[in-house]
Amino acid sequence: MNEMNEAAVRSGWLRCAEAARLVRWGAAIAMSAAVLAGCGSMRQTAAPTLAASDAVAIAPIANFTETPAAGGSAAALAATILRANGLADVRLAPVDGDGNAMFDTAQRDTGERRLAWAREHHVKYVLAGAVEEWRYKAGVDGEPVAGLTFELVGVESGRVVWSAAGTRSGWSRSSLSSVANALVGRLLAPLRPRS
């Protein structure tokens, strides 16, 4: 009888130890999620229904930072991610002859010039945007940080059909390109064809 009591006590202790271990793991996962969630923020509207064959032109992305070519880097990332999302016809819109962005979002040119080019090239949507932040923070750690806004304009209506804004920062050993890639990927994730 005494052996049965000892076995029951041991079994109870083992269950308690297992439960404590699961609680510790759960707490560690919750803390990790909280830390990662604090690394950025994102806001966006509902995405339109896209077909894999819809042509999307990426307008030159405005660069409101002190980092040279941040807009070009963001546009290249956006084009690659949209293709990876399943859109077959993703194009980079040209700059004009003076080297100026054809779709200068700094001047909020949403007029006929942008839409006329898109119509002439049988584009259904134009993705415009701006880089708000693209740098390494000053200080000992020098964490990378990126901030972007995007607007998807329906060429037929000339109206914004989807928009998103987001920021993301990394740790001191992260690269700016990996932080920017993750941010652009999350922002553009809803822009994928639906079957």
Give, region by region, the residue ranges found by the protein language model:
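Sec-dependent bacterial lipoprotein signal peptides
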Residues: 1-39
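N-terminal segment of the mature soluble domain
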Residues: 52-53, 60, 65-121, 159-163, ...
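Soluble periplasmic/extracytoplasmic beta-strand elements of cell-envelope proteins
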Residues: 57-60, 126-130, 147-151, 163-165
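Charge-dense, low-complexity intrinsically disordered segments
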Residues: 26, 65-69, 170, 174, ...
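C-terminal/domain-edge helix-coil "capping" segments
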Residues: 39-54, 75-76, 87, 117-121, ...
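Solvent-exposed loop/turn segments at secondary-structure junctions
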Residues: 63-66, 96-99, 132-137, 168-171
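Short, positively charged
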Residues: 6, 131-133, 188-190
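Hydrophobic beta-strand positions
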Residues: 94, 152-153
